């Protein structure tokens, strides 16, 4: 078995359960094998750039700013600032009048639901646990997925101390060996970006298609 086979088996499980997910989500601090989401607003604006969301958050907080204010805050060149601001304007989130930028729509009260990341490994459960901890910066919960025959080698205390959950994979079946603990370091902007990417890749997956699954306890009601 290859790690790709393990990931494909998990993907199959998620598809059968009607769960929205994305593979190899690149977040700068790591690439999670699988990131899934429950309950996020399906009309989430597709913002996948950290500076783009950060600038929007800054404008939203100040209500109106100048291009110069943004330059000073983010240490960006004027052309780059204009590029970001015009992108936000095209999305209908800000308006521009001369050099003044005003907020139009507040996206920071939108429901992001629950985001869960999974790191899949065949044997290196220690390395996987360390990687999974990084994903807590943009996920509410994080798991390591291992083949069922590898589970016997795992020191569960390491997972319990770090708050990382553990999944046993046998074929296309998943068993939760240890539940994950909620992240205390999940950053809203990073979560928005990761959730945005998952929603964008799952426009045809609807909540009513959900089936009972090992992650059901994390579904927001």
Give, region by region, the residue ranges found by the protein language model:
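Nucleic-acid nuclease catalytic cores
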Residues: 124-125, 139-173
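Amphipathic coiled-coil/heptad-repeat helices and related helical stalk/stem segments
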Residues: 81, 103, 128, 151-152
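Accessory beta->alpha helical hairpin/"wing" motif in late/C-terminal subdomains of nucleic-acid enzymes
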Residues: 99-110
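Conserved catalytic cores of phosphodiester-cleaving nucleases, focusing on short active-site segments
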Residues: 10, 34-40, 114-122, 142
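Catalytic core segments in nucleotide and nucleic-acid processing enzymes
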Residues: 132
């Amino acid at each position: 078995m290859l790690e790709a086979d393990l990931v494909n088996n998990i993907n199959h499980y998620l598809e059968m359960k009607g769960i929205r997910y994305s593979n190899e989500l690149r977040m700068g601090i790591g690439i999670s094998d699988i990131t899934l989401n429950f309950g996020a607003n399906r009309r989430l604006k597709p913002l996948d750039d950290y500076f783009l969301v950060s600038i929007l958050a800054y404008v939203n907080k100040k209500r109106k700013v100048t291009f110069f204010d943004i330059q000073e805050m983010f240490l960006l060149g004027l052309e780059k600032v204009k590029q970001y601001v015009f992108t936000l304007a095209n999305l209908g989130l800000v308006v521009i009048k001369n050099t003044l930028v005003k907020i139009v729509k507040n996206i920071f009260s939108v429901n992001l639901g629950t985001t869960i990341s999974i790191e899949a490994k065949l044997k290196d459960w220690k390395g996987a646990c360390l990687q999974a901890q990084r994903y807590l910066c943009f996920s509410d919960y994080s798991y390591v997925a291992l083949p069922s025959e590898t589970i016997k080698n795992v020191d569960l205390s390491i997972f319990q101390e770090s708050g990382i959950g553990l999944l046993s994979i046998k074929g296309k079946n998943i068993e939760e060996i240890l539940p994950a603990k909620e992240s205390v370091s999940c950053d809203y902007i990073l979560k928005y970006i990761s959730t945005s990417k998952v929603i964008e890749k799952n426009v045809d997956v609807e909540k009513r298609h959900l089936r009972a699954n090992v992650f059901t306890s994390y579904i927001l009601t």
